[in-house]
């Protein structure tokens, strides 16, 4: 039977999605707080940089692995301020996370141009050539078959549509690399235990980050899925990177 990584452990391919889904269900109520604490607020700056990759907000946008909706909500807020006609579909395999996003959109009065769909990134329930942009932030490393998800991204994008991915990456510099490793494997799981009462979930988080392909290797994977003009931009010394590509 086909196996894949769940953190540093090997599990059956069919079991990984259930395990990942279970983790996010258990930490859903503390998800936003944990993001702020773990990244010392940096995730907000990274996401601001990420949405700048979308200059045209008069667009159909698919946000995959939406989680609690940070990316889509920022885009909706920006479009509303500009008077743009944006259409957003928030998709996530975890219904509890998506419900959190829906509640936030209602509280912020940003729900008007949004749809919320529980879906698997490997088998998206959308027609070919449907979207101007495909966004995914801190989600693709949790997909059991990343190559399959990339091919689905290519399929649902319109010709000249843009793929944009924000993901943890590989730190290059020596001192920062050593500190980041210590912080990831020691501090983050401890914060997870104190705040979310779930050390194991955040051990999985840091292990999944450690196993995710390097910037250049992920670039090769994106290109192999059919995309052109594949580029990446490191943020915070390579702690995260923004990957972008076009369907041509």
From Swiss-Prot:
CDD domains: AdoMet_MTases. Keywords: Menaquinone biosynthesis, Methyltransferase, S-adenosyl-L-methionine, Transferase, Ubiquinone biosynthesis. Pathway: Quinol/quinone metabolism; menaquinone biosynthesis; menaquinol from 1,4-dihydroxy-2-naphthoate: step 2/2; Cofactor biosynthesis; ubiquinone biosynthesis. InterPro entries: SAM-dependent_MTases_sf (IPR029063), UbiE/COQ5_MeTrFase (IPR004033), UbiE/COQ5_MeTrFase_CS (IPR023576). It catalyses: a 2-demethylmenaquinol + S-adenosyl-L-methionine = a menaquinol + S-adenosyl-L-homocysteine + H(+); a 2-methoxy-6-(all-trans-polyprenyl)benzene-1,4-diol + S-adenosyl-L-methionine = a 5-methoxy-2-methyl-3-(all-trans-polyprenyl)benzene-1,4-diol + S-adenosyl-L-homocysteine + H(+). S-adenosyl-L-methionine binds at residues 68, 92, 120-121. The keyword Isomerase does not apply. GO terms for biological process: aerobic respiration; menaquinone biosynthetic process; methylation. Its EC number is 2.1.1.163, 2.1.1.201. NCBIfam families: MenG_MenH_UbiE, PRK00216.1-3, PRK00216.1-5. This is Ubiquinone/menaquinone biosynthesis C-methyltransferase UbiE. It comes from Rickettsia typhi (strain ATCC VR-144 / Wilmington).
